[in-house]
Amino acid sequence: MLSASAEEGTYGSLSYDVINAGEIEITGCNMDVASVEIPAEIAGKRVTSIGDNAFRDCTSLTEITIPDSVTSIGDGTFYGCTGLTEITIPDGATSVGFQTFSGCTSLKKITIPDSVTSIENNAFYGCASLTEIVIPDGVTKIYSGAFYKCTSLTEITIPDSVTNIRVGAFCGCTSLKKIVIPDGITSIEGSVFYGCTSLTEITIPDSVTSIWSSAFRGCSSLTEITIPDRVTSIGDSAFYSCTSLTEITIPDSVTNIEGFVFTDTPWLTAKQEENPLVILNGTLIDGTTCTGSVTIPDGVTSIAGGAFDSCTGLTAIAIPKSVTSIGDSAFYRCTSLTEITIPDSVTSMGDYVFDGCTGLTKVTMPDSITSISDYAFRSCTGLTEVTIPDSVTSIGDYAFRDSTGLTKIVIPDSVTSIGDSAFDNCDNLIIYGHTGSFAETYAKEHGIQFAAYTFGDLDNSGKVDSTDIFYTMYYVANVAVGNPGGLTQEQIAAADVDGSDKVDSTDVFYMMYYVALHGVGKDVSWEEVLAK
């Protein structure tokens, strides 16, 4: 950063500042200049740096000579220099900065010295004429979008010194045919090779443990790939639309497979023909060709995102208790699915999980989940009633938006957060909850009708009596031996009189005490009973 007292000057077509006790930084040039030679010294002072955006949008500039005295080239220095065809970065420069050559569409050749250790974000973004580049051995990091849409780049050598290739580094390099990822890389980050449509061969080293979202998406010429044994996770859409991919070697080490990983590949099509339920290492990755009633086999531990995306022929599904997670958009727009029971083994459900399931009329959620995700039941127009389990603490953004048939939702006291527009366009909705609860506050603030349900009144008779005590005792006894309790979620919420988020013998005691006091004419409140 320049000090307030920095001395300014000009040298031919160049402008500069005197910085750092007598060093020169080039700060700009005449916009119509075609050729520039930066001197090593100006007025006896060494030229050591070129400032941020110094030659930005100098579209007439076709050649430039930079002296070895320059050790720092700023961000965006040659951004948009569309006439520049080649450049040599001087020895001593340590990085190719943010957007340094971004938009240099005529740049065909660049020499990067061994002194450079990093290539920053979008450094060569859109350098559409660049055909090859050699990255020197000293480089350790290639940052996000560094070579984004270098559409003429056919080959690139990445040295073993590189340990980090960031998101989208080679995204859209449509002429790139072959690449070897060095041994030091531990993760292939998101969209790194997205849209490399000419890529036919890639070597993934044994050091890699994860492949991120969309890493190879749209690599339409890739025919085979071997995933090394240390990889444990593959992100969503990692190989999406690899339309020539027929052979994939996937080790047992891969235990986390996200959504749409192999969508639109010949490999997946072949698997679907063998069995419409495509299961890989315990993850159900695809069931989009299923019709009618489907039973997921025991042993499946997760349902990947988009597994049944737009599976309009699916009418019913049985999920085993081995399943612990259901991914984003797993049942997105399954318009013929009418009801679903989620087992209590499931602890998480992704965003959009039942979004657009217009035929869904009944959903049973377990006490094992703690949140209703964003867009989870958006546009489920057939749903009329929903009971949120006591375990849930938050309801996400747009969770029930446009579920226009929804007239009743029971929200327990455990819920303390409801996201933006969660119930938008649910015009006939009544929220049921306890007086003084967050649900009541939310309903009033958002102009939604609220109905309070009474503690202890399980049969909605308007009073708490021996019938309610019997129902509660029956529930507690059955649950204690592992049987279904026989109560709805709404009844369970009413039976949990002590607010412990569970129904047990303590609730039975308080109900008996409450009924006994009222039986002898004492009109006590629940607050008074619980205070005893």
Please place each PLM-identified region on the residue numbering.
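Structural signature of tandem-repeat unit edges
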Residues: 13-22, 31-49, 59-72, 82-95, ...
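Extracellular adhesion/carbohydrate-binding repeat motifs centered on closely spaced tryptophans
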Residues: 18, 237, 267, 271-290, ...
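A recurrent domain-boundary module in secreted/ectodomain proteins
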Residues: 265, 438-454, 524-532
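Cellulosome-associated attachment modules in secreted, modular CAZymes
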Residues: 453-532
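Sec-dependent signal peptide cleavage junction
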Residues: 1-12
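Structured segments of extracytoplasmic/periplasmic soluble domains
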Residues: 57, 80, 103, 195, ...
